[in-house]
UniProtKB/Swiss-Prot annotation:
Origin organism lineage: Bacteria, Pseudomonadati, Pseudomonadota, Gammaproteobacteria, Pseudomonadales
Domain EngA-type G: 3-166, 193-366
Keywords carried by this UniProt record: GTP-binding, Nucleotide-binding, Repeat, Ribosome biogenesis
Residues annotated to bind GTP 1: 9-16, 56-60, 118-121
Organism: Pseudomonas putida (strain ATCC 700007 / DSM 6899 / JCM 31910 / BCRC 17059 / LMG 24140 / F1)
Protein name listed in UniProt: GTPase Der
Stretches with biased composition (Basic residues): 467-487
Amino acid sequence: MVPVIALVGRPNVGKSTMFNRLTKTRDAIVGDLSGLTRDRQYGDASWQGRSFILIDTGGITGDEVGMDEKMAEQSLMAIEEADYVLFLVDARAGMTAADQMIAEHLRKRNKAAILVANKIDNIDPDVARAEFSPMGMGNAIPVAGSQGRGISALMEAVLGHLPRDAEDEALEQDVAEGEEAVRIPGPSEKDGIKIAIIGRPNVGKSTLVNRMLGEERVVVYDEPGTTRDSIYIPFERDGDKYTFIDTAGVRKRGKIHEEVEKFSVVKTLQAIKDANVVIFVMDAREGVVDHDLNLLGFALEAGRAIVIALNKWDGMEPGERAYVKTELERRLFFVDFADIHFISALHGTGVGNLYKSVQAAFQSAVTRWPTSRLTQILEDAVSEHQPPMVNGRRIKLRYAHLGGANPPLIVIHGNQTDSIPKSYSRYLENTYRRVLKLVGTPIRIEYKGGENPYEGKKNTLTDRQVNKKRRLMSHHKKAEKKRRDKR
């Protein structure tokens, strides 16, 4: 399971700056899932190959009223969700009553936490540590978040206390085996294809899970655990193994009450990270809403294969259906590679077809292609549509090979690759998708510039070459002397 780290502290101590630095912005979830998470913002981050989910919270002052009180409540909820807490304080302002209140809350909850003294620019780190030592949170780690100073030491201290995710361990093993190692995930003997069922509350996730498991199978799970535990449900269908990752929990069909279904962002994000394929469930009667786009965006950033299920399609008028299809085409253009199914989880209409799309998306996401095949596709694409000129020189793309899977990563080598425009990258992506007949999975293309293997190396001659050079020089001198003597 991917660990969760929460950033907490008073307002303006640098939590958002730290969040942006660790998520590198492009890895952060687009938006803050407004309406579901209030002021909590969730991001997918990594440090030296270790993945984790980061939560940015609103500030806590201890004297909140009205909306500020609700924001503080959300910050305290983030503490409960997290495996580890980064408690940020302002080294310039010194210790405050609000800092002491937060420290007391962390102690009462027996929460694993580390004290971070931020904004140490032009401040002696030892003085900063001494300032906050009365809080009883241990030695503060000094950082300057805006400049990135001290971040490495902080993250090494934090990640040393967190469990390793299975995917991270596999990637580290690849690195140990060599730079060119490529991990191609496949269905494990035990779990089969792991499918995450995600979506907003009340769209019918639990109804769909029970329907896909089979009418005759009634599953009851009442296991103790934290609020962010997901339910893993292994099963077989037509000889194929699967594992559902159900963020809503699985209940008896007669006891499913969609209106009280809990929604946890953390559970959803962790389920996406742990899955091979995501089935994204939407309510056809509500159409496409911003929350749907946010969740789909995270699944896309995580590189997971995607199947879209538009639930509650039954009973809709033809005009309503036509409008919804138009909206899907307009707003879901960024996942146009995903199969869309119009279903009724309650009545079972169209549900069986989901398995075919899951299988196709998974196979597209994990299939191996030899370097010769990927290079031939590249050469054909370049022949049909040349890359643009840069400073009077044509960009040259030499060969391509597979760099990873789930999602497929195609590494293209050439020169001036830093100057390749996004439009040409989209052209190559679409070409690979069309030729390889890929469905349901995003594709990532990575460029590597051509490097001169002799750059920076001295031209050292062998003994034989040195002797030959001497003979040639001696012969040249004798010939030159003869020419001068004849004159």
